[in-house]
Amino acid sequence: MSMTPREIVHELNRHIIGQDDAKRAVAIALRNRWRRMQLPAELRAEVTPKNILMIGPTGVGKTEIARRLAKLANAPFLKVEATKFTEVGYVGRDVESIIRDLADAAMKMLREQEIIRVRHRAEDAAEDRILDALLPQARVTSFSEEAAQTSSDSNTRQLFRKRLREGQLDDKEIEIEVADAVGVEIAAPPGMEEMTNQLQSLFANMGKGKRKARKLKVKEALKMVRDEEASRLVNDDDLKAKALEAVEQHGIVFIDEIDKVAKRGNVGGADVSREGVQRDLLPLIEGCTVNTKLGMVKTDHILFIASGAFHLSKPSDLVPELQGRLPIRVELKALTPEDFERILQEPHASLTEQYRELLKTEGLNIEFKADGIKRLAEIAYQVNEKTENIGARRLHTLLERLLEEVSFSAGDLASAHDEAPIQIDAAYVNGHLGELAQNEDLSRYIL
């Protein structure tokens, strides 16, 4: 990650409105990963990441920050829900599976990068194999045995290669030998994913090297052979070593819904298991060693970002040891009508742009006017205040309701309006949503 904190925040601003404190915190944490790697090895081992706790109501951008961060980081990244895990001894997934999943994500990411790197060599090798399958047929039907021995053989191959690249042979059927994939589906109860993965790897290795002849169209065969050649060019042992280092030095884990495993007051019963999940998370965040497919992974330098709405509980309800392991606290603010207005217009691929482009595919143009967007933002804010506050997610519900009739009759409306756009102004919004927004009982169930 060679981007500066300012550049990271600028990139996040393209997709997320407001929440500057949270953006700055994750930008600094991400940049510190790069800074640490520039230190001498001895000092580098001592510098541990400062984990982050993001606190804020639902729908204000916590999860969206995680999603965008994953694309920016170019590092092994995993987002998990804290509620999916149970204390060791209970039925369900244990928290160590987080690191196993992170290791799988690292392996997948590096394999994809490596396949892109060797793509050109794989394409050349795949073309040669397809031409080997094609040319015997061409020789029999088009050339005499004497001509096959001359230099015209090379010319023919080049001619066929040109036709292959231009797609002229895509529909021709050929018989070619490809790897025989052994796929075994194993159903196992929750919490036994590691055993399932090991069994699947075992069966996959048993079938490795087996090949069978298949009749395929050239287009399908080329794709299959290209993937096969790319996999052959990738060295799995090197990849595992790189993935192990990437997880340990650059891994990022985003734990959502951390508030749902916080103990609320002095409630007993099921909350015992919740506290158990927190205690199981402690060694993971503090630094321990977890057995994965890649080998033993040390979690000392993995960055953990936790987030929660904390509606029914407080950050102080987390066990004290876990609070201490999340030293950076960031509070995300509830959204205002002005924020809703900006969310509808400013982000890259904003909601209004998405609907506009979707309907354009049917030849129907819609235009969101400034007063219409303002009224929509006001209604979203009012409904959130009167009912449950679900933040920016309310806009999805409102826009679906607002454009339901237009979406249903898009084809007919496109013919009727020719190229004139449908104007979505304040009057249009009030006509479709005004009554629902005013009626609290209706808005509770419909909006």
Swiss-Prot record:
Gene3D superfamilies, per the entry: 1.10.8.60, DNA helicase RuvA subunit, C-terminal domain, P-loop containing nucleotide triphosphate hydrolases
Main function: ATPase subunit of a proteasome-like degradation complex; this subunit has chaperone activity. The binding of ATP and its subsequent hydrolysis by HslU are essential for unfolding of protein substrates subsequently hydrolyzed by HslV. HslU recognizes the N-terminal part of its protein substrates and unfolds these before they are guided to HslV for hydrolysis.
Name of this protein: ATP-dependent protease ATPase subunit HslU
Matches recorded under PANTHER family: ATP-DEPENDENT CLP PROTEASE ATP-BINDING SUBUNIT CLPX-LIKE, MITOCHONDRIAL-RELATED, ATP-DEPENDENT PROTEASE ATPASE SUBUNIT HSLU
Location(s), subcellular: Cytoplasm
Subunit text: A double ring-shaped homohexamer of HslV is capped on each side by a ring-shaped HslU homohexamer. The assembly of the HslU/HslV complex is dependent on binding of ATP.
Molecular-function GO term, any one: ATP binding
Domain of life according to the entry: Bacteria
Binding residues for ATP: I17, G59, V60, G61, K62, T63, E64, D256, E321, R393
UniProt keyword Ribonucleoprotein present: no
Protease recorded as keyword: no
InterPro entries (alphabetical): AAA+_ATPase (IPR003593), ATP-dep_Clp_protease_ClpX (IPR050052), ATPase_AAA_core (IPR003959), Clp_ATPase_C (IPR019489), HslU (IPR004491), P-loop_NTPase (IPR027417)
Organism: Pseudomonas putida (strain W619)
GO cellular component: HslUV protease complex
Coarse class of the protein's main subcellular location: cytoplasm
Record's keyword terms, sorted: ATP-binding, Chaperone, Cytoplasm, Nucleotide-binding, Stress response
Family: Belongs to the ClpX chaperone family. HslU subfamily.
GO biological process: protein unfolding; proteolysis involved in protein catabolic process
